[in-house]
From Swiss-Prot:
BP-aspect Gene Ontology terms: translation
Native source species: Trieres chinensis
Name of the coding gene: rps14
UniProt similarity note: Belongs to the universal ribosomal protein uS14 family.
PANTHER family: 30S RIBOSOMAL PROTEIN S14, SMALL RIBOSOMAL SUBUNIT PROTEIN US14M
Spans traversing the lipid bilayer: none
Subunit structure: Part of the 30S ribosomal subunit.
Name the record gives this protein: Small ribosomal subunit protein uS14c
Annotated compartments: Plastid, Chloroplast
UniProt xrefs under InterPro entries: Ribosomal_uS14, Ribosomal_uS14_bac/plastid, Ribosomal_uS14_CS
Role according to the record: Binds 16S rRNA, required for the assembly of 30S particles.
GO molecular function, one term: structural constituent of ribosome
rRNA-binding keyword on record: yes
Length: 100
């Protein structure tokens, strides 16, 4: 189980990302379309003034049950340990244990 503070930090990052994504996208689009060097610097400084945790690449996928950041399966939203437990207890429809 991950620390509660880490899980809350991720929730805060997701909230900040949702809040600042439109503003960040408009600034980035203006930055790409501008050819003047000075105006590019101005736009770049505005982008840098946005909160660091509002960037999308700061968000880490975490298991919804345990908060584990590694061994994460996107299709199910859980870590490998939880996926195995849920598959064995038939909580995931259509998932079967492979045998060959």
């Amino acid at each position: 189980m991950a620390k509660k503070s880490m899980i809350e930090r991720e929730k805060k990052r997701i909230k900040l990302n949702n809040k600042y994504t439109p503003k960040r996208n408009t600034l980035l689009q203006a930055y790409r379309q501008t050819e003047d060097f000075q105006s590019r610097l101005d736009i770049h400084s505005k982008i840098q003034k946005l909160p660091r945790n509002s960037a999308k690449n700061r968000i880490r996928n975490r298991c919804w049950k345990t908060g584990r950041p590694r061994g994460f399966y996107r299709d199910f939203g859980v870590s490998r340990h939880v996926l195995r437990e849920m598959a064995h207890s038939c909580l995931l429809p259509g998932v079967t244990k492979s045998s060959w």
